[in-house]
């Protein structure tokens, strides 16, 4: 099951604000938390107690909290890979190792008596995960997560992201990646030019970022990296169908009520005899074969257009299609709507027999 997550940074906020954010995110179905203990400089006991209080609140709401720990903090706290009791006492679900060990240590850590998950960095493109696997870890407790990148243009290229993600998915591991909120104002560091894993996501709406990660079929958990996302963003992301590809669309004023019903309410799947020009969803032409589909808005067809054949197309009338290429319109096809420009690229991820749907963009 795919999941949604948020991030909190207790060293840059307050316990009260973090708890409010957790409660709000829980309302919209989020159940994973990324947080990091960057340092224990200053009042060590106070920092740890505040972490415990925040994590306890998260746990009560059903969140799974993974704590990113820097090597420096490992040393400051005297933590050994042989003894992870500190994180168990914090109430953490697991720990994230941004910088790893030799492979043997990670393997040993997966056998910790508390069942803590050991999350390793997916973004480096080395044989790191292969090395850990050669040391026979407890695979149930080993998961992966990409980095996020605050510096503009420093995020992962798509090809590198796919290569790295496949390394982990080939082992059947649970995976995660980060998306960025437009409304959030901070992360763990002073630079705040967005906190995404993929560079191409930096200027995209948050829901589109999430749809893309899920569409790759290589990412299980999508986490908002910066804090705090707005309630509107959380609500929109929480409403997302995580298992089925959906597209934000606009409909034209000329579109009839029946055509709106076909687009928005009927179930759709990508017919198996694939065309390079269109994605066909044919059940509506069967269900509504006795209805009238008068010609209207029969302009030339562009990639990303939503189409319904009119009565001039005989037995095809009522069939819904998505244009994959620009096409000549002979007057037999009504152009009823269009996928929003920033999501047209997601068409490349639909495969034969995939189920899909549409959401009317307000």
Name each region found by the language model:
Residues 17-39, 88-94:
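Catalytic domains of carbohydrate-active enzymes, especially glycoside hydrolases
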Residues 31-54:
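Glycine-rich, proline-tolerant flexible connector loops at the mouths of alpha/beta enzymes
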Residues 36-38, 44, 68-71, 92-103, ...:
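Catalytic beta/alpha-barrel core
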Residues 121-253:
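Catalytic alpha/beta core domains of metabolic enzymes, predominantly
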